[in-house]
Amino acid sequence: MPSSSSSNSRPGVPPDVIAALEDALGRDRIERNEASCVFFSTDLSRSGVAAAAIARPGTTDEVGAILRICAQAQVSVVPRGGGFSYTGGYLPINESTIIVDLRDLNHVIEINTEDMYVVVEAGCTWERLYEALKSENVRTPYFGPMSGFGATVGGALSQGSFFLGSSQYGPVADSVLAVEIVLADGTTMRTGSWGGVDNASPFYRSYGPDMTGLFLGDTGALGFKTKAVLKLVPFPRHTQFLSFVFDREEAAVAAVSAVGRLGIAGECYCWDPYFVKVMAAQSTSLMQDLKLLAGVARGQKGSRGLFNAARLAIAGKSVFDGEVFMLNISIDDPTAEGANARQALLRDVLAGTDAREITPSAPMATRGTPFINFNTSERRTTMRNLPTNGLVPHSRLAALSRDIRLVLANRADDMARHGIECGVIYFGVGQQGACLEPLIYWDDPRHFQHDRVAEVSNIDALAGFDGPSETTEIAMQIRKELTAVMVRHGSAHVQIGKTYPWLATRTPPIAALIGAIKRHVDPDGRMNPGSLGLADLPV
């Protein structure tokens, strides 16, 4: 980490505010280096206005001190976790902004296997939480995104998230019992049964109005999460896997919904032919392959893990051959008989389709190594990817899929001319709906100058670029067109950030209510301004 320097001149925040923050946290906890401030003001989609400073608290009290100081000085504050936003979630919109890096609040505070909950700080990564719980033979129902090596609990709760465990248990919000929140004036509060005045326990969410839900998916616009209480389930004793391929997208989409409605699969996700080809062409070294097989063996106990690792090794990458859609399923159960019964039921459900069963290499590998460190030097390339997600009820998934394909077909010439590629993944999310997620890929040397390994931006190199390239602008326009189609189909979204039109698509009574709440908890509109569309509200 670059050294802190209060003498390093940065615009936007008066020196006495910086001095007060340094007094509250220590000088080494306030970063003003330009390369760091620009980096922390850039997410996976774009750059915001560079923050005046980065503050790194280590406790809830220190978060409260930051927010109090900034509120008194009319300075904006933006929370940041692992930095995996791709919708402008933590990007400042004005120079008078302090970014609050919450990753030092990273402790697993209590694992209560009697009452089946865990108390964890918001800056803890999903991988760290998973490993701590696994040692106690428990797990959270939803247990993280694939980016959970660096993505934090607080980031997922603020922006919304689904993947591991989500086909059976729903998105992350459905696994939350309570949260600890710091409001704009520095006040700390707790929700659910944890918010009682005497002998409070966080075991129950639904005591009175659901105050926990109010602060989930809020993008940090209503409060900064410092702790969360999540449900626990016994760590699955038995896991089975299935993979199928389809020639037709309509059949694959219908299969995602058929599996999702049953609610018996931990994960259910389908890759289109683009992603199947990516997996087939993936160039890995022998050492990386051995690590993957070791992960599969380690991820399941005893002979079952060794057997599945051997199956994966024998199948190799041949399972990724062909112009096909690939459906991948993980199945958890307390007993081998139960896991086998679930597996048999899913085979029966898909028997009447054009599904062809193949070796389940992909879901085995995912569960064997569930969290990937994306921020490594060997993964640093100029190739970017930008997801766009839309969650719809099962009854609307096929129509949304067709309209998304029309957008991509209409843009095919532009994409070919500029080297832009796009693949689509489908996810089952709970029993009521599914997600369609196109990912756009293109080459962007400018964005490469934001180094996610060193966590600094190359200021000199960035100065040599005259704004975003034409290719980047076209990619962003395609994303807007995809989003517009999703909105037309009534989609919900995770990672709302400053991209999806949440407020603009709410009915007037909801917009008025959220405006009143925002003005109560953040009367000056200084908490992550612009997120949720709340910058459009009068304060």
Language-model features: where?
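Long, structured ligand/cofactor-binding scaffold of large enzymes
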Residues: 40-139, 151-162
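Flexible, glycine/charged-enriched surface loops at secondary-structure junctions
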Residues: 28-34, 141-144, 253-284, 293, ...
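Conserved glycine-rich FAD pyrophosphate-binding loop
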Residues: 2-11, 44-50, 75, 80-82, ...
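Short, conserved charged micro-motifs
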Residues: 62-65, 128, 249-254, 334-345, ...
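Charged, glycine/proline-rich intrinsically disordered loops and linkers
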Residues: 191-205, 279-319, 445-473
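Conserved oxyanion/phosphate-binding beta-strand-loop segments in alpha/beta enzyme cores
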Residues: 20-41
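A conserved active-site cap/scaffold subdomain adjacent to cofactor or substrate pockets
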Residues: 245-248, 317-356
